[in-house]
Amino acid sequence: MKLHVAALATLAVVCILAAGSEAAPKAMSDPAVVKAQLFPDAFWESFKNVSMEFKKMVHGLQTSNIGEHAKSLYTDTVAVLTPYLQKIRENVTKMYQVYVESKQH
């Protein structure tokens, strides 16, 4: 049960990030906006925590004895989410670069 809750929570975060990632390039075009409010240090700490929890969940699924049906569902879910995760990773990388540049000025 705990594993299912973690999977659903992670899926919710992925969906939220995917929805926000479409608007991210527009926001990044104005460095003043980035500096002012979009990416405080707490945002990046939270993002690191979510990423770490996702990695733990994936490792747990890969190493657990959950049965072939559940592993098949997991594999199918990862196949569907991978393109979205790659787009999110690209956009978050861009946002982080802008964030780092804003800290240097």
Curated annotation (Swiss-Prot):
Q: Give Gene Ontology CC terms.
A: high-density lipoprotein particle
Organism in which the protein naturally occurs:
Petromyzon marinus (Sea lamprey)
> Under what name is this protein listed?
Blood plasma apolipoprotein LAL1
Q: Which residues form the propeptide?
A: 22-29
Q: Which domain of life is it from?
A: Eukaryota
Q: Which cysteines are joined by disulfide bonds?
A: none
| Tissue-wise expression | Plasma.
- What GO biological process terms are annotated to this protein in UniProt? lipid transport
Q: Where in the cell is it found?
A: Secreted
Q: Which residues form the signal peptide?
A: 1-21
Q: Which UniProt keywords apply?
A: HDL, Lipid transport, Secreted, Signal, Transport
